[in-house]
């Protein structure tokens, strides 16, 4: 069986930066304890499990404000997905120490929304409902930001001005965003468009679109909560025309997927640890459908190998 290792794949700079920020926090003895992450620092359970070994507690809930209600003291890390001004204010009121690990691409979208609100615009924001990134973006200006996920959401959308900006969640499928923007243009012809698919998401989607078409099957390594990982599987099926499955790690691969398959493409979401992806590739490279000794699918990557290394600061 031939393995097509789609490139680029895996970690983006925003994810690595967020994890380094959190690791440095774990090593900083001057920070008030306990240290919490407000939601998953990135959408990957292997990463959050590894941070728990570092002594950092991940709390999750229906919204960032709901999670904050569970915290009365210590340090709070805001995730790469960004948070609303209300969340920052609530943390300040509670006397919590805060560390912001928001991805710079997300911050850029927040700044854009603030600027357009000051100019009297309303904003149509294309994103996934119940995902933390849209929650933070809508929270920048909830009175003028309208979240839509699909074309049906446009049917009941009414905006009391011709000054409309359209932007989006950074990890959406660029093809889905383009189609929705075309629909929005028809209903709101005066709308201005500012596509905010981050470069890492864009190039990974384009790589799948161009490289997965030679494969019989695509395996996307990524957490079920990872929107960008789920979108890679979608791109493989809808753009490259190749059946795709998303797996959290090697243990989720089903042997029946591989029956009659000669070429398997492998990619990974932007929040997927590299050792987890390498383990999937290693399994596929040694797999022999005629040899049961090659069928074992057990994740063996230790949590200590999941997080990026950071330098321990020496005391002066």
From Swiss-Prot:
Quote the record's binding site residues for (2E)-4-hydroxy-3-methylbut-2-enyl diphosphate.
43, 81, 131, 170, 226, 228, 271
Pathway(s) of this molecule: Isoprenoid biosynthesis; dimethylallyl diphosphate biosynthesis; dimethylallyl diphosphate from (2E)-4-hydroxy-3-methylbutenyl diphosphate: step 1/1; Isoprenoid biosynthesis; isopentenyl diphosphate biosynthesis via DXP pathway; isopentenyl diphosphate from 1-deoxy-D-xylulose 5-phosphate: step 6/6
Q: Which InterPro entries match?
A: LytB/IspH
Q: Does the keyword Iron-sulfur apply?
A: yes
- At the top of the EC hierarchy, this enzyme's class is oxidoreductase
Write down a Pfam family by its short name.
Answer: LYTB
Biological process (GO) annotations held by this record are: dimethylallyl diphosphate biosynthetic process; isopentenyl diphosphate biosynthetic process, methylerythritol 4-phosphate pathway; terpenoid biosynthetic process
Details of cofactor binding: Binds 1 [4Fe-4S] cluster per subunit.
Looking up HAMAP family in the UniProt record yields: IspH (MF_00191)
Q: What is this protein called?
A: 4-hydroxy-3-methylbut-2-enyl diphosphate reductase
| Taxonomic source organism | Bacillus anthracis
């Amino acid at each position: 069986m031939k393995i097509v290792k789609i490139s680029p794949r895996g970690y983006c700079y925003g994810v690595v930066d967020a994890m380094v920020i959190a690791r440095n926090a774990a090593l900083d003895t001057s920070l008030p304890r306990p240290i919490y992450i407000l939601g998953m620092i990135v959408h990957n359970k292997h990463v959050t499990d590894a941070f728990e070994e570092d002594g950092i507690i991940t709390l999750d809930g229906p919204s960032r404000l709901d999670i904050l209600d569970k915290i009365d003291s210590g340090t709070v890390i805001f995730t790469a997905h960004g948070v609303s001004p209300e969340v920052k204010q609530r943390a300040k009121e509670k006397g919590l120490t805060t560390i912001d690990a928001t991805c710079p691409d997300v911050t850029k979208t927040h700044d854009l929304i603030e600027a357009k609100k000051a100019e009297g615009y309303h904003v149509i924001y294309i994103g996934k409902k119940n995902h933390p990134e849209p929650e933070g973006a809508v929270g920048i200006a909830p009175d003028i930001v309208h979240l839509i996920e699909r074309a049906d959401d446009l049917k009941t959308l009414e905006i009391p001005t011709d000054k409309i900006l359209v932007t989006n969640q950074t990890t959406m499928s660029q093809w889905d965003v383009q189609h929705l923007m075309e629909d929005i243009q028809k209903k709101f012809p005066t709308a201005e468009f500012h596509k905010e698919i981050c470069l890492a998401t864009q190039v990974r989607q384009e790589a799948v679109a161009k490289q997965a078409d030679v494969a019989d099957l695509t395996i996307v390594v990524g957490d079920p909560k990872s929107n960008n990982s789920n979108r890679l599987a979608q791109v493989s099926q809808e753009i490259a025309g190749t059946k795709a499955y998303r797996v959290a790690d090697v243990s989720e691969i089903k042997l029946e997927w591989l029956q009659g398959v000669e070429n398997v493409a492998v990619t990974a979401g932007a929040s997927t640890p590299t050792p987890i992806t390498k383990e999937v590739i290693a399994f596929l490279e040694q797999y022999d459908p005629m040899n049961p000794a090659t069928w074992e699918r057990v994740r063996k990557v230790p949590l200590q190998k999941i997080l990026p290394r950071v330098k321990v600061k020496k005391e002066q």
